[in-house]
């Protein structure tokens, strides 16, 4: 019999385990052989000891003793404090009595007062004693609670120690039993031999491995148990991580301006840019990391990702500057602003010259208006301001910027020439701006004049005369003889009365820039038409991207003026730079703030220009529609003949559906002009050229404004491409690239090749095997291929820019001096939506 007893930290075990082992040998016969088998019988009994009962009694006794000691201590402290308070009160009373005896006998009234004071002092002392007693009781109660809490903690510690001792005891008992079993197995293996010995050794080896694994596991458990008890418990917990990862993303306040890139938005939300792009893809918007998105899209993305959005107004300074202006609320009648428009050489400037009684037309190059002239005249005590425009560029710019500077359009049509292309363009501009038209039929003094034909032709363009039941006034005039000029002025004044034109006269002025240029001696000069208020010399003017103080003002006759009221045009000096035609001019208070606003506008201009370049692209039409920016596809159609124009416009209108509409903004016959390009830029339109080309001035505007210009020679290709764009299925594009242009200087006759054109290559390279077109006055008259290309009697494959050559066009002999031969090649371009 063995007894396993373990004492840990001096504590007696609560139980005793008694083990008894009996070994016997049994003889058996198997297969005719006698075999001895050893049998071992183990018995175990656990007997509880008196140690547990004694420990429990000791714990209860310690708890009672601690409670008694704490109560006695609290009681003694309270009694001591009360005794000290009473002694202090007694001493104070004795001192008062001694002082009272030293003082001479007072009068009866004084004695009554002293008695009253003594009664009050006695009451105060009684209250003080009561307060001291309450404090002593409170202290005693707190001390008792602390003693009770201390006893409970002591009890918990004792229980923990007992449980630890019990665990250590059992762990150690297991090890002791395992060690004893191992020793017994080793003895058995030493006494055995042969196969049984080998078999038992193998079995014992497996048992050794299992027991070894068990011992290692128990050893780890024992080590962990020791680390978690006693003083080392806090150290073990201190080694653990003291924080956890947040379960959700932190919501932030995201400040968003008018525009922001995807990368900047991700940085403000403290997330990866890929997460922002994923969110945008889920919302149906495709974007790259450097793409600029608008404020509304950025707000939706940030709110979708759980952040709070703060909208920042970047133009807050501009709004504050514009709002800080004193404008008198009193409205007065103002003079009408009249724009003279019409075809070239129909007499616009001559008519205006006769009205002003000044010979200005002779001073202009070739009699053609080189710049905008702004003048005001008085008739019958009433004033009229006239604008004479070349090409209507400023008028279109004003309309594009929303500045309605013109009140009435006087459309000048020559009676002997009729309605011409620029006349139609002028009508389109006036209707787009919503301005009434007064038609002046000029040159009626000529023998071939036919004013009735002009009225009939204008009916086709929805300009209906009053005698036909319309609302458009027709006046027959002669700018040369002055016939009908007074009637024209009366018609203008009558139209202005119908419009009831009013403006604020007093206050800070606003206006629009009619024209501007850079003078070598005076610097930037801007002609400003005042619309409201009065412009004074010395005012601070904010004008588009420029600003400055008005140093001098001059009227149309070159005389200095101190102020200018509504509808008065003046030349202004003192701006920081040359503003653009159509910019709004505003008088502000602070020059420093005006400079800040001008710099802010300059910074925003680049972003607006980049955004505008993408809007008019045919490939991006559906993207813009998805964003809600484009509800219809604006188109300008120019063709070589009127029949093609009518057929294309009718076919495009038939393509319109309920979702996508094709709107023909303008159409006409002839080459693409500067006016077409300006109208396309203002109305965000695509220019379609059918057998026509754009001239140099139009190409400059198209390149600077990034207008989408497309050339076609087959109407079905034009319609199919527009149809493919509308259906969203853009096929691979075969684009015609012009690689060379040759100008015909002379024509020679050859017996074999027919007409040979002696040409000078003006642009690019002329190649022999490429297709060509013959242009006359920018209109395609033949399309084919070259039959021969020679230079100094030698056949060559190509001729470069600046060289002369002889060109023979196959199956075409009607080449004339001044024609242009255009060489192009067909290039396949893959489209992306």
Swiss-Prot record:
It is found in: Cytoplasm. GO terms for cellular component: cytosol. Residues 342-349 are annotated as: G1. One of its GO terms (molecular function) is guanosine tetraphosphate binding. It holds the Pfam family GTP_EFTU_D2. PROSITE patterns: G_TR_2, IF2. HAMAP family: IF_2_B (MF_00100_B). This is Translation initiation factor IF-2.
